[in-house]
């Protein structure tokens, strides 16, 4: 089942943005990590989405066993921005999110949700991270224009049924990304990056793929990796002290150097096309014992009644004292 699901994700990947999208796909984490949250607390989406952007989250302060509640994740960004797609063209940003719940908490089924909750989640397909980690929820990619906020329906566990769960305060870890990443799952760079000079020297030539790889001289064509074999890919040649050096720049990033320009190693030779980024927040969530709530309500009621009786007793004493003075 998992293989079928990953295949579906790959199909969406291909249809959505080209051959190597590095998009807002939290599912990429499933391919490389057993747990999307590292020991340091960092959610691994940040390893591919290198730019930091805000994430917002609304989490209830407290819930009771069996309660179906919602966690709302906000993914704000400038809707006028467009990102560079895998083929170098411009398009809208996709968004995705991951919610790391305490163990025992899980995604609510449609039957468990209220009508309002079903409507809030009707256009989102949320899945557990894996069969072993049903407490970690993923969603995305989704069109960012329609999904500035994503709602996760969650069921709270019952410590009476699950001894591993206790009535206590927990932490919820939430990550939200928008736009394509800078690192592909295999570790290669996507075209949503700044490309830099490989060595100190002078730019001597720029060869461009107009239609296919045959547009380049054979010695340059051999340098182009398969994922960059696209119209618009450029091969920059630099004259350096160590001989001729080359840099392959995929379509999308715009060159900021011209033939004849001198560069230092590490200097940017393109602009930074990235307009997206990843954000992470943490929230407290209390699993409340309903029996304690009942006793608390009873205690508060007793305190209120006691205070009322004291007030009445005081009034009674005042009336007696007034009568004695008049008598």
UniProtKB/Swiss-Prot annotation:
Biological process according to GO: photosynthesis
Cofactor(s), by name: heme
Keywords: Electron transport, Heme, Iron, Membrane, Metal-binding, Photosynthesis, Signal, Thylakoid, Transmembrane, Transmembrane helix, Transport
Cross-referenced InterPro entries: Cyt-f_TM, Cyt_f, Cyt_f_lg_dom, Cyt_f_lg_dom_sf, Rudment_hybrid_motif
Membrane topology: Single-pass membrane protein
Oligomer status and interactors: The 4 large subunits of the cytochrome b6-f complex are cytochrome b6, subunit IV (17 kDa polypeptide, PetD), cytochrome f and the Rieske protein, while the 4 small subunits are PetG, PetL, PetM and PetN. The complex functions as a dimer.
Protein name: Cytochrome f
Annotated organism of origin: Synechococcus sp. (strain JA-3-3Ab) (Cyanobacteria bacterium Yellowstone A-Prime)
């Amino acid at each position: 089942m998992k293989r079928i699901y990953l295949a579906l994700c790959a199909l969406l990947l291909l249809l959505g943005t080209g051959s190597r999208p590095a998009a807002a796909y939290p599912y990429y984490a499933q391919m490389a990590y057993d747990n999307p949250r590292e020991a340091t607390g960092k959610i691994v989406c940040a390893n591919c989405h290198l730019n930091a952007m805000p994430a917002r989250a609304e989490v209830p302060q407290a819930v009771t066993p069996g309660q179906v509640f919602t966690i709302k994740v906000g993914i704000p960004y400038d809707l006028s921005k467009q990102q560079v797609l895998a083929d170098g063209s411009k398009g809208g940003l996709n968004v995705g999110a991951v919610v790391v719940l305490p163990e025992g908490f899980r995604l609510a089924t449609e039957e468990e949700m209220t009508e309002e909750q079903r409507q809030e989640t009707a256009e989102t397909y949320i899945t557990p991270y894996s069969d072993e980690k049903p407490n970690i929820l993923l969603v995305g990619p989704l069109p960012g224009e329609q999904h500035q906020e994503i709602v996760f329906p969650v069921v709270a566990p019952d410590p009476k049924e699950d001894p591993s769960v206790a009535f206590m305060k927990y932490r919820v870890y939430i990550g939200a990304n928008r736009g394509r990443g800078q690192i592909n799952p295999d570790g290669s760079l996507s075209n949503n990056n700044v490309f830099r000079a490989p060595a100190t020297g002078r730019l001597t030539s720029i060869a461009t793929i107009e239609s296919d790889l045959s547009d380049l001289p054979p010695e340059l064509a051999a340098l182009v990796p398969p994922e960059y074999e696209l119209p618009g890919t450029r091969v920059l040649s630099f004259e350096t002290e160590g001989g001729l050096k080359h840099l392959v720049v995929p379509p999308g990033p715009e060159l900021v150097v011209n033939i004849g320009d001198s560069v230092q190693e590490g200097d940017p030779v393109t602009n930074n096309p990235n307009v997206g980024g990843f954000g992470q927040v943490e929230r407290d969530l209390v699993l409340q014992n309903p029996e304690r709530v009942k006793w608390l309500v009873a205690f508060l009621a007793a305190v209120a009644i006691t205070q009322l009786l004291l007030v009445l007793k005081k009034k009674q004493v005042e009336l007696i004292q007034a009568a004695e003075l008049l008598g």
